[in-house]
Amino acid sequence: MAMHDPHEKNGPDAVESRVQTDFPVERFGGNGSPGVRRIEVISSQFNLVHRIIFFFGVFLIAYVYGLDGTIRYTYQPLATAEYQSHSLLATVNVLRSVIAAAAQPTAAKIADVFGRVELILLSIVFYTVGTIVEASANHLYEFCAGAVLYQIGYTSVILLVEVLIADVTSTRSRLLFSYIPALPFLINTWISGNVTSAVLKVTSWQWGIGMFAIIYPVCTIPLLAVLFVGHLKARRANPQAYKFSLLDQGVGQFFIDLFWYLDVVGILLLIAILALILVPFTIAGGAVTQWKTAKVIAPLVIGVLCVPAFIVWERWCPHPMVPFKLLKDRAIWGALGIAVMLNTAWTLQGDYLYTVLIVSFDESVMSATRITSLYSFVSVITGTILGAIVIYVRRLKPFIVAGTLVFMAAFGILIRFRGGADGTNHAGIIGGQILLGFAGGLFPYPAQASVQVASKHKYLAVITGIYLATYNVGSALGNTISGAIWTQVLPGELENRLGNATLAAEVYANPFAFTQVNPVGTPDRDAVILAYKHAQRLLCITGICLTVPLIAFSLCIRNPRLTKEQTLKEAEEIDDK
């Protein structure tokens, strides 16, 4: 096993790259897969300058998709309201989460087979095309189609930057460097509201989304450039270790192997299960319940039938999407449980938060955008400080457990402060989001780091993809539950409090238009505020209930001592059992 020149290892706790030349080249999977071998060879050529450019490139990409995500999160309610379908906001979010859940493990395998650079290029295509479709959509279904394409690109690049960082860092420094993609939230939290307001003053939300079809591809250039330079140096320095072919057995056999390795059938079954079961819950409610209609019953039945088919398939197929061997370790399944419960609970309070801030708290667009970003802002500050502490403490579990307990306390505050235009409620919702963000800095990223250090490097991309997939499954579940509660509860509350079915339907379809002509203090606005407060209260109560299993999962994970190695020696032993 070749070790690169120690003088080249200039990053803080940078892991020594391991270029293997003494094993047979496998076509797919393992250390022999082209993507894994390629990044090991490339990173072995990095000096200090290359590493600085590398991390700057990661930061720049993260800055752009982070700003875009924050702004798009604000514009999405406006878009659905413009289509007179604001209540279907959860449906759009469920579709995005379903695609993200399926895309994560798929993108991880693509990164292993074809390479990290190729995944960046693929993400650019989907991100750009999806953004253009969303910005030019005239109907909700067109907007959803664009959101799905955008989500594939967005999901792929999020996975990629986390995998790249894990590729070149040690176990004890990984948490600190994992926060590089999150650092832009320190800036975006405060400027996103200004950008959102400025765009809406001079143009429409369509341009606010569409401009990133140009900005994002341009900002990927520095990272692509440094990886390309590493690629050229690697080919010159060690051509034998870099020499491999995906087509050595012919094009036809390659696509057959790729079909099995990517587990295409498993991906389709997973999408079918999540979409067909979860989406109906977000559309069945409303002013007139639709639970007995075919468009709700049929997808539910088909989705349920797909569950046993998925389990049987994953047990039988040669390259399952879910690596059952790894899931036997509580270090893995405990962290995956944290990911699901965390995002389910967070999404419950966050899905309609922007709308509640505008309608119930009477916040401005700028203020509402900033408040919805407070979680990310505070969690990044907390997590970055924690990452530096972990380098010396070398343990993760105590912080993860503490974070889940604080997370529960934050939900208690959010249940208390869920609406009202006075200063007390304004301070209360801000305090709740800050405490939620503090908790978010203590355990989501540490849980991801813990699942990475428990696996060999050859499983790194796949296990990171599985973790992020379960994260998005949590989002899908949260979106579904919030959408179901919102559509089942809010229409009746509005009608009861307003005493006018027509006005209630108008508010339900487009609450933002209603707030513009009905200021706080008018009878109708006060009635609407009470209705929205009631719905948000139910969402937050459901969320705090889910923090109980969240805490339980945090107690189940392992507490290994972190080292300067890329993975722990214990991980090698666990995976080989």
Curated annotation (Swiss-Prot):
Disruption phenotype: Leads to lower ferrichrome (FC) and ferrioxamine B (FOB) uptake activities, which are reduced to approximately 60% and 50% of the wild-type activities, respectively.
One GO term (biological process): intracellular iron ion homeostasis
Record carries keyword NADP: no
Localization: Cell membrane
Major location category of this protein: membrane
Family statement: Belongs to the major facilitator superfamily.
Function: Major facilitator transporter involved in ferrichrome (FC) and ferrioxamine B (FOB) uptake.
Protein name (record): Siderophore iron transporter 1
Organism of provenance: Aspergillus fumigatus (strain ATCC MYA-4609 / CBS 101355 / FGSC A1100 / Af293)
Lineage per the UniProt record: Eukaryota, Fungi, Dikarya, Ascomycota, Pezizomycotina
